[in-house]
Structures are given as C-alpha cells and as structure tokens.
C-alpha cells in the first residue's frame, strides 16, 4: 500500500467532478482489496474556521491550510479528497486501523463567493449523500447563532435532503459530529449539546416536508454527536489531547460513528461511480436515490449471475435447438433450457441477495428467455405453416382422390388444422405458451387465404375449360352452319349455342336449380363465375359471327349457294342446258336463293322474324356507371341498346350493297360463260369433215403405222407421257428442262469465249513482224485500238 498523502480535488470550484478518482484510489491502496471496509468522512463549516487544520491533525492528511499571520482568506476551493490510514489517537501505533477517505469541503460564508450560496448548498448536500460521518466545525461562541453556525444553510440542505430521500424506505443515516472549537468548558458541553439539538429539532419542524414525510423527525435521518476541542493557540496541549481523544472515537470499533446503517455498503470502485452520479444529479437538480449496500450489491451480483446464466442458456440453445426438431422435441428442449437457466443457474445463487432485487432481476431474465423462446416458437410455427400449406396444396390437387373439389379442400383443411394443433400443443402443455389461440387464428387466416386462392384458381380453370370448349366444340359447328346457310340459319346456330351452354352448366346445377361449381366458394363467387361463363359464351358467339361474316366471306357463301343451285340439280348432278331459256330459269332461281341467304345473314333473327339480342345483364360495362348516372341514365341505356343491336345487325345496308355488286359481277360472268357454251355446242364441226380427212390422209396413216421405228418411238413417248401425267411430274419435268436449257446456254457461252481468247495470240503474232521492220512507224489505228 502506498504512503501517498497528497489530496486530489474531487470537485473543483467550477463544479466539475474529477474523472481520475478511481486511479487515485488505486495509487493509494495498490493491490489491497478493501471491499466495503473503508469509511468516508467529510467536514463542513465556515470559511477559515480551521477545518483543514483539524483534518490534517486528526487523519494525518496534507490539506492546504491558511497562514493566519499572512492573510485570512479562502484556502480550500471546491471539495478535496485524501486517503488516510493513520489516526492521531492515544492508542498503540501498530493497531489495526481501517482506511479512511476524508473530504475537505469548501467553507461557507466566504467573501470570495459572496451571496452566491449555490455551491455551498450543493457541496453540503453532496457531503451528506456520500459520507458516513459529517463533521460540523463551529466555534463555541457560534452556538445559539443562526447564520453564524450555518443553521440557515443546514436548513436548506436538510429540506432538499428530505425532499429527495424522505420517501426512501431504506433511509441513509448520517452521523453528525459537531466539533465545538475553542471549547472553554465554562458552558458545559451537555448544555451546548441540548441547545444545538433543540435548534435542530425546531429547524426540522419548520421544514417544508413533502407528502408522506409529515411525521418524520430529525433523528430519523441524523444521529447527532458532540465533541469539544481546546484552543489551538492558547491551549496547545489541551488541543492536542482533545484531538487524541477524538481520534480514539474513530479508532474504537465500538464507537457509534461507524454503525452499519451509516455505510453506503458499496465497493470502493462503486463508491466512486456513486459519488459522481450523486454530484451529477445534485448539480442537475435531479431526484437522487441512495440505495443501500444490500440493494447495490444485490443488483450488481444478480446482474452478474443472470448474465452468466443467460450466456450459458445461449450456448446450450445454439447447440441443441435445430430446425429438424418436431414440435414435441423442440418444446421439451426449450423447457429444459429454461428450467436449467432459472432453477439451476440463477435461483440458487441470486436468491441469497435482497429478495426484491432478486425477484426483479429474475423477472427480467425470464423476459429475456421468453423473447428467445417466443422467437423460436414463431420460427417453428412459420416453418410448420409453410410445410402444412405445401401439403395442403398437394392434398387439394390430388387427382387420385375422387369427389368434388369442395370435399378435397375441406378434407385437406381439416388435416392441416389438426396437424398444426398437434405440433403446437406441447408448447402449451409445458407452459411455454400462455395461449395457442393467436397462433391458431393466424394459421387459420393464412389457410383461409390459400383456400380462397385455390377456389379462385379452380373457378378460373372452369372458365378456361369452358372457353376451350367453345373453341373446340362450338366454333366449327357454327362456322359450318354459316358456310352453308339456310333461311333459318340463326335458329340452327342458336340451337347449337344454347345446347352447348345448357349442357356445360347442367353438371353444376343443384336440385334447387342454382349453379354450384362445387369449389366451396361463396354464392356470390358462384354467381359471378356463372355470369362470366355466359358473358364469355355470348362474346365468343359475337366475335365468331362478326369475324366470319365479312364482306368477302359473304360473297363467297353466296357464290357457293348460287353455283350449287345454278350448275347442279336437286340430285347433285351437273346440269346440261339445251337452250338459253333453261339457263335463264336456273340463273333466276339461283340468284334469288343467294340473295335470300344474304338477307338471312344480315340480321340475327329467328324464324318468327324477331331479332336475337345479347341479354342485357351480360353486356360489359365500360366503367362504374357513375358518368351515366349524372346524365339520368340515358347514355347508359343508349350504350346498352347499341351493344345489343351490334350483335344482331351483322351487315349494314352499305355492306349489303357492296356484297350485291361483287356478287352481280360474278353471276354476270357465269351466265355469259353458260350461254357461250351453248353456242359452241350448236356450232361444232360437221361429221363428214372427219370422214374426208381420214380418206385423204389414209396413205400417210398407213405409212406411219407400217414403220417399226415410228411405232416404237410412239409407244415410248406415249408411255412416258402417261407415267409423267399419272405421277404428276409435269412441274418437275418442266423445271428440269429449264435448268438443262440454262446449263446448255452457259456451256455454249463459255465455248464461244474460249474461241475468242485462243484467237488473240494469233493476231499478235501477225502484228509483231511489221513492228520489227519499222519501229519508228506510228501504230495503226487498229493497233492503237488494241
């Protein structure tokens, strides 16, 4: 242990706390572990009343003191701290003395601060908060005075102290040691003591007490003690002996100065932090709580024990909790970890400390554990929910299961809910969950969402299959009826359309005649789907009819009808006209029937001449109807009528005129061709001309027939022509001939080009002799050209 006696300024005159206090303790004590075996003593009194001198004499400290022979002025500024292990007493030098930490507080009523008493009050309150013994240094002649013995300052300090600590059940008591300086003994110490106690009690009764502290007394917070010291200058020996006697009171372990209720019960490092916090709260006028040593130690130790237990819990948790555990296994592991942490690692060690603190920290630890447990259960529920949802989808779509989709969903839903509750039950049984209702409700909401999604998908699939059936089963039939129309073509079309629509909905019609698609969906969803099917069917019919019956297609249909009636009889045999009258009759009949087909196709109506309209309820709306309502509904009515008439009115009058014009052009050509064929037939070559040709050319015919080469060549040519015609090879043969002709032409051009190139050297040879004979001759025009 160091013999360091120099003091440090704990709080400077600018009210700043010294952050190196703990280092000072380390320098003073070295490696010594004092624990709570130390005492804090402070001194309070007027400026220049000899406080520092008394402390230096009594505790062997080195506080600065005033040189009265030079000037009386402020010496101690702020609050100073010094360590002492020596007490000036009459006892043996080697007796065991605890460690003392002495606070020298700046004197009150100094000229330097004047009327500024803020620091005086805060310093006095700080000394009361952190000290076991507060030495009140006063002169004997100040007893009975109010300002002279700092009673005004004490009243203010006591009042603030009461407002801060009065409601604390574990009140921190302080021993007030009134040291009466220059005590002459003329007035007995007991009389002075009685006067001071009376003043203190009277002052206490006049305090403004907070609610709940009305019945408190001065002695509930303070234990007054009194001691007289002789005059230091005029009674040096008496003063010395009195200081020794006072020191004996501090050394005597049985003295009343060091009762357990005075001590803060904090380790020394804890006292440093505690003192700093006290000063910060006093400086900032915050409520100050001075817990007892048991509370502080309990908090410190229970925090330490809880932290160790929690860390062990985390280590065990990371090694034992995995995603592969099922509900029962996971619940067992979590319950074991929780019980071990609380019952084994925390309770046996922490229960030895203050019950209230132990229970509070236990609750905090349980909350920490529950946070992890709840998070683990939530993750488990999330994984379980995802797995069950996936299984639910598989079961709902299992094609091996017979029955309506509604029964499949219901069965899959019951199975998923049952499995979920089974997996969650162990957590409730082991009290890891207070209630499963929240998780079950959340799971059911998730499953219901999936059910609604599957139902919607199934309804969409029904609509898709219906739309596909329209294309596969109905479209070709309608197009066939339109391609070969009759006068009652629309009755036939609507018969097929109604038959398909009713047949598609019949299997979904229940006994009450209402549509139920057996998906478990609501009535509104079924009605909406039924409406969609019917609307799609009519929309399909609309697009099919209007898409096929274009102007060109209608002209083709009329041509076919005209040709069938004009060129063929009722038995389907081709007609052979003998005269123009027959042609004209067939023409008029065929044209009339073709035009009647045009009239039938132009407007969708039944045999009773009533237009067939799309049901008004199935007409698609262009908006929410709000725009129509502003106009009294008139525009909406007109729009609906337009869509209905658009379906039934296939061809407009203008389109019919165009179609008739194109059709007339076709029929005019047909009748002209027919009449021309009659003329050609009646003006054929006479038969005697054929006989004359044979008679005159008989010799040539015999010559050809008698020539074997001609016969063989004719047979080969005729056979080749027959096979080419039979195999339909005239096209490839013609293409081959064209290619052969092209290649022959290319070869011929190449041959001519080669001949020209070969002729060129010969011409050069003929020219060179002439050039050698006359080099200076001008070249001829042919040479220049070459």
UniProtKB/Swiss-Prot annotation:
EC number: 3.6.5.-
Main location: endoplasmic reticulum
Domain GB1/RHD3-type G as annotated: residue spans: 35-262
Name of the protein in its database record: Protein SEY1
Positions of transmembrane segments: 685-705, 709-729
Chain residues that bind GTP: 45-52
SUPFAM superfamilies per the UniProt record, alphabetical: P-loop containing nucleoside triphosphate hydrolases (SSF52540)
HAMAP family cross-referenced by the UniProt entry: Sey1
GO CC list: endoplasmic reticulum membrane
Topology feature Lumenal, residues: 706-708
Keywords on record: Coiled coil, Endoplasmic reticulum, GTP-binding, Hydrolase, Membrane, Nucleotide-binding, Transmembrane, Transmembrane helix
Location of this chain's protein in the cell: Endoplasmic reticulum membrane
GO molecular function: GTP binding; GTPase activity
Membrane topology of the entry: Multi-pass membrane protein
Region (Disordered): 765-786
Function: Cooperates with the reticulon proteins and tubule-shaping DP1 family proteins to generate and maintain the structure of the tubular endoplasmic reticulum network. Has GTPase activity, which is required for its function in ER organization.
InterPro entries in the record: G_GB1_RHD3_dom, P-loop_NTPase, RHD3/Sey1, Sey1/RHD3-like_3HB
Cytoplasmic topology ranges: 1-684, 730-786
CDD domains per record: GBP
GO biological process, one term: endoplasmic reticulum membrane fusion
